[in-house]
Every structure is written in structure tokens, then in C-alpha cells.
Regions:
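Flexible, charged surface loops at secondary-structure boundaries
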Residues: 39-47, 67-68, 164-166, 216-224, ...
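Helix-loop-beta element that forms the nucleotide-linked donor phosphate-binding surface
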Residues: 184-189
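Structural signature of tandem-repeat unit edges
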Residues: 23-31, 48-56, 71-86, 91-102, ...
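Bacterial Sec-dependent N-terminal signal peptides
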Residues: 1-24
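Amphipathic alpha-helical interaction surfaces in cytosolic regulatory modules
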Residues: 63, 84-87, 240, 264
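Consensus positions within tandem repeat domains that build extended binding/scaffold surfaces
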Residues: 106, 136-141, 161-163, 263-265, ...
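A short acidic, amphipathic alpha-helical/loop segment
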Residues: 60-67, 138-139, 237-241
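The feature captures the LRR N-terminal capping module
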Residues: 20-43, 198-220
Length: 320
């Protein structure tokens, strides 16, 4: 998978690969609309990581949406998308023309009735081709766990209304192309990061070890986008986060022992979309999250929090 993920055990057991149950498959689709002929429904529903090559159309996207119940990571960076006209695509129950090299409208969002839509909530990461021209309306609407959209194209594809949520998804683009994306219509509010997404889960047994363990594993702190820390944290670890991790998108501290988020820890983390706070948290320091303008949704404060210092969430206008 393109998201580099390691599990660091700091109690001297070394580095273990993430061992969550995964089923990875790769298929080359020779004829558009025939993906489901290559596997059974039972096989499709067990796949978590899918790489597709060859030729796809809106029929294939409908099956990806409606079956493939556990699909988390979808890589179609080496697949082309063919034009399709008919009633068997992703649009609800009507004839529709789906243009070539476009992510179809409602590709991963199913209409339940006139006002209710259901996104594919299992999906966490998609990797799109450098040939994609459009991401059509509602393509990823309601995909509430889609944390990563990687686009291989150096210029932004056209983004149609409701196609992708800037409050949920960080967009990873080729080196040197983030300015072009920021100037694209409907792309202006997204968090753009150049290069490949990097995620790390660290279990700390010795306080202050976060920096040395990352470097020992060959990961520079500045490259980390998705950070999960378990175990013991001290001020040195928070200082590392504050001073050397500018590109954080998502942070999970729920299983660490910290009772205080120190002053200025996450100040001006401009890509930060969400955070899970330590369960035993008691205090949030001054300006701890100030200027995190993309931090959004509902922030759950642990029941033991008794102090939120001055300006802790100043400028976090998208938080509820």
C-alpha cells in the first residue's frame, strides 16, 4: 500500500509491520464493465486493498460502490476510464452518459431516496490516474472516512459540486503542483500535501523516545501526516510535534497517558483535519490549537478536562 505504515515497539521488540487483517488483490480489466466477472461476490466482499489496471467504466464503479463491502484502499492510477451511456452506471435508475476519463457522478455514493444519500464509508484512500479529467458531482459524497485522495496529475482535474469533502479528505499531489491545485475552481479550501502520504503508529514505553524511534525507523518527523501515539508521552515528545511535524493531517493520542496538551503544541498546523485527544486529558494549554483553520467536525473532550487555557482553539472556525 502506498501509505507507509509502521508499528514501532519501543520496549526493545523492534519494528513490526501493521498486522490488521488485510486482503489485497490486483486485477487487469481487459474490457470495460467486466470487473465482476473476474471474481465472486464473496471474494469481492473480503477485499480491503484493490489495485485495478486496464479499462473501467461506470458499470465497474457501480459494483465497486455496491459490493466490495470491506474496501478501504482503491488504486486506479494505472487504469483508464471508458465512456459509457446507459442505465447500469452509478446514476440512480436512469439513462446517463458518463464521459471518458472522469470519475463517474455518484461513483461511491448511493441514492437511497429523493433526499438521502449513502457514501461508501469503508473507503479510506483512493489513488487516481494522471489521465483523470473530472471528478464528477457527488462522486465521493458521504465517504466520511476517506482520509486520502492521491492524484497523480500535476494539474487539477475539474471538481464538480459535492464530489469531495474538504473537511474529511486531504489531497496528495505530485511534487511542485500544490499551487496549481490551490488555484483550481472548488479546490481552494482543500489541504494539499506534495508527495506520498506517510502514517505511523508508535507505542512508547520510554518517555521522550518519539524522535529517536522515528529516525531509527528511517522516517523524518517532517514527513509524517498520520500519527498515532500510544503509551507514555512527555514534554519532549510534544515539542517534537510542535517544532518538527508541520504536515500533520490526523492525530490520534487517545491511548497515550498525557494529561496536558502543552502550550502551542499544534499551533498553525495548517493541514490538520482531525484529532483524538488522550482519554485522561485534564488540561489544554494556551493556543494549543490556534490557527488550525482546517480542524473541523466535532471535537470530543474527555470527561476529565477541567481547564482550557486562553486561545486554545483561536481561529478554529470549523470546529463544532
Amino acid at each position: 500500500m502506498n501509505l507507509k505504515k509502521i508499528f514501532l515497539v519501543i520496549a526493545g521488540l523492534g519494528i513490526l509491520l501493521n498486522s490488521s487483517a488485510q486482503t489485497s488483490k490486483r486485477y487487469t480489466v481487459a474490457k470495460p464493465g467486466t470487473l465482476v466477472e473476474m471474481l465472486t461476490e464473496e471474494e469481492a466482499n473480503e477485499i480491503t486493498h484493490l489495485v485495478l489496471q486496464g479499462k473501467l467504466n461506470a458499470i465497474d464503479f457501480r459494483h465497486l460502490r455496491d459490493e466490495f463491502k470491506k474496501l478501504q484502499i482503491l488504486d486506479i492510477s494505472n487504469a483508464s476510464i471508458s465512456m459509457y451511456a446507459g442505465k447500469n452506471g452509478t446514476h440512480p435508475d436512469r439513462f446517463y452518459v458518463y464521459p471518458a476519463n472522469c470519475i463517474p457522478s455518484y461513483a461511491f455514493c448511493k441514492q437511497i431516496n429523493d433526499s438521502v444519500f449513502a457514501g461508501k464509508t469503508s473507503l479510506t484512500q483512493v489513488i487516481l490516474s494522471d489521465k483523470v479529467k473530472n471528478i464528477e458531482d457527488g462522486a465521493f459524497k458521504g465517504c466520511t472516512n476517506l482520509k486520502i485522495c492521491q492524484i497523480r496529475k500535476k494539474t487539477p482535474p475539474n471538481l464538480l459540486p459535492g464530489a469531495l469533502a474538504d473537511s474529511v479528505t486531504a489531497v496528495f499531489v505530485p511534487l511542485g503542483s500544490s499551487d496549481a491545485y490551490r488555484n483550481g475552481k472548488r479546490w481552494e479550501t482543500f489541504a494539499f500535501i506534495e508527495g506520498e502520504p506517510v502514517g505511523v503508529t508508535v507505542q512508547i514505553a520510554a518517555m521522550g523516545s518519539l524522535a529517536s524511534e522515528l529516525i531509527h525507523a528511517g522516517i523524518q518527523p517532517k514527513d509524517v501526516n498520520f500519527l498515532t501515539v500510544e503509551g507514555k508521552m512527555d514534554e519532549a515528545d510534544f515539542t517534537l510535534i510542535r517544532n518538527y511535524m508541520p504536515n500533520l493531517v490526523s492525530v490520534d493520542l487517545s491511548r497515550c497517558n498525557a494529561t496536558v496538551i502543552p502550550d502551542y503544541t499544534f499551533t498553525q498546523k495548517k493541514y490538520l483535519l482531525n484529532i483524538k485527544l488522550p482519554h485522561g486529558l485534564k488540561s489544554i494549554g494556551q493556543r494549543a490549537f490556534s490557527g488550525c483553520g482546517r480542524l473541523c467536525g466535532t471535537l470530543v473532550l474527555p470527561s476529565g478536562v477541567t481547564a482550557i487555557e486562553y486561545g486554545a482553539f483561536m481561529g478554529c472556525d470549523n470546529l463544532r
